Amino acid sequence: MADLVRQSKMLHTDATKMPYLDESAAKRTLSGQMWVYYGDRDHPFNVFDVCRDHSASGIDAFLKDKNFHGYLNADALNVYDHLFRSGTMTEVGCWAHCRRKFYEAKESDPARSHLALSRIRLLYQVEEEAKQIIAAQELTGSEVDEVRRQLRQEKALPILSDFQKWLLEEEPKVLPKSPMAQAIAYALRHWQALTRYRDDGFLDIDNNLAEMTLRHIAIGRKNWLFAGSQAGGDTAAILFSVTSTCHRHRVDAFAYLHDLLQRLAHDPQPAPELLRSWLPDRWQPPPTESADSG
C-alpha cells in the first residue's frame, strides 16, 4: 500500500504524537510521531508511518527518499518547506487551518474576524455547490474535476481576489503581534498554496481528510497511552493502515483480516498482482457456506 499511495497525484498528510516506551530506560517514554498519508481517488489507501522524533526524517524517508512527485496537501509546518523547495512536491494549502487562525482572533478582533470567516464560508459554499451538482449528475473521475474547476473559476476566484485585497488593506492597521495580525500574515504568506486549488479540480480546498483520519489515533491514545516499543509503534502503524483503509472502503476490517491471514497461510509469497487483488479496495469476501451449498 505504501508503494501505491506514493503514486498519487495528490497526497494529504498530517501527523500526531506517538509516545513509545524507551527500551533502555524503564518507565520512560519518548516522543515520536504517527504520520498518515491519505492517497487520492486513484490510489485509495490510508498509510500510517511512525517516526522516532519530530524531525523531518520520517517524511523524508517516506516521500523524498522514495521519489514521490506530486501535490502535497498539508498544514503549513516548517517540516515540509525543504520538500517544496526541492521542486519535486507542490504545496496545496489548507483553508480549514487558515480559518482556524481567524477564528482564534475572534475574541480580540470580532469585527475583522467575522469578515474573514464570512469570506472563507463563501469559499466552502462553492465547494458544497459543486458536491451537489456532482451528486445530482452522478459524475465520476475527470468529470468531477472539471465541474469543480469551472465552479471555482467562476465563483471562488472573485471571492479570493476580494479577500486578498482586504487582507492587504487590513495588514498595516492591526497590532503587529495580535492574533489578527498573525492570521493575516499566515494567509498572505501562504496565499499561493492556499489558492492553488482554484485552478485544478483534482485538488482539495483543505486537509480535512488527513486530519479526520488521524482523529482516531488521537482518541485512541487516551486509552492506550503509548506504544510498548519502537517495534510496537511500527506494528501499530501497519494495523492502522489496514483497518483505516478498510473503513475507507466500507469493508469489515475483522472479516478482511481473518480472510487475509488465511490466504497468506496458504500462499506466504503471493505474486504481486494476486497480492494487489487482496488489498481492501479490491478484496472480495469468500463465499459463505450457504452460498456454496446452494
Please give the residue ranges for each predicted region.
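Catalytic center-proximal scaffold of phosphoryl-transfer enzymes
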Residues: 1-294
